[in-house]
Amino acid sequence: DTAFGAGGSPLETLERVFLAHVAFVARHPGVPRILYHELQRPAGAAAQVRLRTMVSGYRARLARLVGDAKAAGQLSGTLDADAAAVHLIGAVQGLVMQATLFGGERGMPQAARRTWALLLDGLRGGRG
């Protein structure tokens, strides 16, 4: 919530949220493991429902932020805000998986900055 409300342009906020998400996971590497474990429970389990609700809300907030950045001319006007939000979350999940496989939680913030540069190019639609 702090990263969302710290001010700045929509694109600056989006970057700050992405980097804050990765930094949180780097500081608390057990959290994703617990969440993934909860997803293995039978469909409809209370923890699974709460997790889905939480992630859906986060995805919606990201999509609104992407929409704001589009409206401000910071991102491509043809960008699908919902798909962009899914890919931003997926990028964090990919960084988590890499850190889990290779024990690199401490390197996650640096990897996130490199990943953000790559994502930003796609979000801008090749406009630079």
Please give the residue ranges for each predicted region:
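Short acidic, glycine/proline-rich loop/turn micro-motifs
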Residues: 1, 45-48, 79, 99-103
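Amphipathic alpha-helical segments used for helix-helix packing
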Residues: 26-46
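Hydrophobic alpha-helical connector segments
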Residues: 1-31, 81, 85-88
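Amphipathic C-terminal alpha-helical segment
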Residues: 23-27, 64, 68, 88-106, ...
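Amphipathic alpha-helical packing segments from all-alpha helical-bundle domains
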Residues: 27, 45-72, 82-86, 113
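Secondary-structure edge/capping motif, primarily at the C-terminal ends of alpha-helices
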Residues: 3-4, 35, 39, 99-102
